[in-house]
Amino acid sequence: MFSKVIDPEMLEDCFYIRKKVFVEEQGVPEESEIDEYESESIHLIGYDNGQPVATARIRPINETTVKIERVAVIKSHRGQGMGKMLMQAVESLAKDEGFYVATMNAQCHAIPFYESLNFKMRGNIFLEEGIEHIEMTKKLTSLN
């Protein structure tokens, strides 16, 4: 269901999902949504019957750590385990790419979801694009 993005059309599908979720639903400015890290990130896309429904990206921070960013599931596909499957695919990709630690700036409303996946909060709540976030981290192991 989830694939590593390998062509411009797949990347456009990622941007479509992100625009729907972050720009249209959450009010993030469109000019902030696509950033300077797109080309150095590894993107994942999930399709359902040929329609793009979920995406995330990972960005190397150093030799051992990857930052998980832009995690998004289209509204019609939430509450069905899609987010959990997406995060499992993200973690698998990160491990396949040789990373041992994952970090992310999680939206605070999603803290329980990420805690259920064994991410731990670190630091204090901060605002990003007017939305409360907190850093969360996880050691990636082969036992996921």
From Swiss-Prot:
Gene3D superfamilies in alphabetical order: 3.40.630.30
Amino-acid positions noted as binding CoA in the UniProt annotation, renumbered to this chain: 71-73, 79, 112-114
InterPro entries xref list: Acyl_CoA_acyltransferase, GNAT_dom, GNPNAT1-like
GO MF term set: acyltransferase activity, transferring groups other than amino-acyl groups; glucosamine 6-phosphate N-acetyltransferase activity
The EC number(s) this enzyme carries: 2.3.1.-
Record keywords: Acyltransferase, Transferase
Transferase is among the record's keywords: yes
One Pfam family linked to the record: Acetyltransf_1
First-level EC class: transferase
CDD domains listed in its UniProt record: NAT_SF
Domain N-acetyltransferase: 1-141
Biological function: Could catalyze the transfer of an acetyl group from acetyl coenzyme A (AcCoA) to an acceptor substrate and release both CoA and the acetylated product.
Family: Belongs to the UPF0039 (ElaA) family.
Protein's UniProt name: Putative acetyltransferase SAR1027
